[in-house]
Regions:
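Conserved alpha/beta-hydrolase "acid-adjacent" motif
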Residues: 399-405
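N-terminal cap/lid segment of alpha/beta-hydrolase-fold proteins
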Residues: 25-66, 432-438
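Short beta-strand element of the alpha/beta-hydrolase
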Residues: 67-76
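Conserved alpha/beta-hydrolase
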Residues: 89-106
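Short beta-strand/loop motif that positions the catalytic acidic residue
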Residues: 387, 393-395
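Alpha/beta-hydrolase
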Residues: 218-382
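Catalytic active-site module of serine/aspartate enzymes centered on a nucleophile-bearing elbow/loop
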Residues: 423-428, 432-457
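Alpha/beta-hydrolase active-site loop
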Residues: 109-130, 145-154, 158-163, 443-445
Length: 457
């Protein structure tokens, strides 16, 4: 929604949030992260900002005179306040507004289109601060597809997320007239709805109790090493697997559309939405993904890009993913509700995960082919085609997103766009081995360098 100047003046700027604590990723404390320290530093201070009635933010302000470019950071987990982007970029002289969307608070995650009006409010808020001349939207991981979704709709209106190509249209209010951006920074992003689709286990039909051994990526006969929890799949198995994964995905999407029709025509038990449980479909980073135990998939980019090396040099080269095999818990948790089951609703599934593929669908060493990048409004590559402002895509080379990052980069309409990868950095920016040095510093130094280039904005 658009926020008038009077409304902005009414936003509460509460005292510095000294009690807010940083939180560790993945700490097993009732699903929450553990406290590790206050969000304060000699180089910056923070203020809690209320953005209307559906969002909150933490504003990082540098101790000295801030730079004229300000950043917004967004992530769908709605827990952004202590993400590294805030303190790292504030250390480098930037104001950073870390936004948490709080609408639909009872749900673990809201549909991505629901976040956008709050982001727009944040853009307008930053533009009202003294000295701010440019506003750049930044997202990491799942926040990357929020960045591309916002950027596309801010430039082209809500028609961009409800055209005939979409399996399910955006439904949020207030998507026309979103505040325009001056640039975007996309950090180690997933591909959006396709990331969910790629977790579908084709060895499952409708029940985890019955697995098809011809399609089971977690058995030795197909190339999986259960002791080492890594794999080497044959080309024949991969071809069979991807064909079956696409077929099962199409059935799941069609089942969801049939239930949507039942809701709409009144034959469902529910009038607004209904439960939708998909066994054998991974939750977030879990799933039946060949590229997790077998690193020959999504192994390298097609083209040369800038590699930020540990020795301080920057070289143009094909980016190699140096990750170890991952996804070790999936094979031993195939019947887990929290690991290998989508426990969602019909409308949420269609809005966040429904993807259309073609007969040639496959994930290769350097590409993802046969995906309709316009079939979901929650698709990073499709939305990137609607972004014309300067754009930076960064990947972490000790993770499996170097190829998705290149796909997003290739689809960007921006004339001024850059792709850079950080040698030896994992998804959370730290080094996978000590010899790769301070990968966190290298990452955010480059973001600063890119933002600061004269004439960029």
């Amino acid at each position: 929604m658009k926020i008038a100047a009077a409304a902005l003046m009414a936003m509460s700027l509460i005292a510095a949030a000294t009690a807010i604590r940083a939180q560790e990723e993945g700490a097993p404390q009732s699903g929450r992260r553990g406290a590790v320290g206050p969000v304060q530093s000699e180089k910056y201070h923070t203020q809690y900002i209320r953005l209307g009635n559906q969002a909150e933010a933490l504003l990082y302000e540098p101790a000295g005179t801030p730079k004229s470019t300000a950043l917004i950071f967004i992530h769908p987990d709605r827990n952004t306040f202590t993400a590294p982007v805030g303190p790292q970029m504030a250390d480098r002289g930037y104001r950073v507004l870390m936004i948490n969307y709080r609408g639909d608070a009872e749900a673990r995650e809201a549909n991505q289109d629901q976040y956008l009006p709050a982001i727009s409010t944040g853009v307008t808020f930053l533009r009202g601060l003294p000295g701010v001349q440019k506003v750049v939207l930044t997202g990491h991981s799942g926040g990357g597809h929020l960045v591309t979704l916002y950027g596309n709709i801010a430039e082209h209106g809500s028609a961009a997320c409800k055209d005939a190509d979409k399996i399910y249209p955006c439904t949020a209010q207030g998507l026309d007239g979103l505040a325009k951006l001056d640039g975007v920074v996309i950090l180690d992003s997933t591909l959006g709805a396709f990331h969910a689709m790629s977790s579908v286990d084709p060895a499952v039909d409708t029940s985890n109790n019955h697995r098809n051994p011809d399609l089971d990526m977690f058995i030795a006969a197909n190339g999986y090493d259960p002791a080492a929890k890594k794999a080497s799949y044959s080309a024949a198995f991969a071809k069979r697997f991807y064909a079956a994964q696409a077929a099962r995905n199409a059935k799941i999407v069609n089942d969801a559309l049939a239930r949507l029709k039942a809701i709409q025509n009144g034959t469902s038990d529910f009038s607004d939405d209904e439960p939708f449980v998909v066994e054998g479909m991974g939750d977030q980073a879990s799933g039946a993904r060949l590229y997790q135990p077998d690193t020959s998939f999504q192994a390298h980019t097609k083209a040369q890009h800038l590699l930020l090396k540990a020795d301080g040099t920057n070289v143009m080269t094909v980016i190699q993913s140096m990750r170890p095999p991952v996804g070790q818990r999936t094979g031993s948790a195939l019947k887990s509700l929290s690991v290998m089951t989508q426990n969602t609703t019909v409308k949420r599934f269609l809005a966040t995960s429904a993807t259309r593929t073609a007969a040639n669908y496959a994930i290769t060493a350097d590409d993802v082919i046969g995906v309709d990048w316009h079939s979901s409004f929650n698709m990073s590559a499709g939305n990137a085609e609607g972004i014309s402002v300067p754009a930076l895509v960064m990947t972490m080379s000790c993770h499996y997103l170097v190829v998705p990052g290149e796909i997003i980069y290739d689809h960007l309409a921006s004339k001024d766009k850059s792709y850079a990868s950080v040698e030896g950095a994992v998804h959370g920016f730290s080094p996978c081995k000590p010899e790769y040095g301070d990968t966190v510093k290298r990452t955010f130094d480059y973001v600063d360098t890119w933002l600061s280039r004269p004439g960029r904005f």
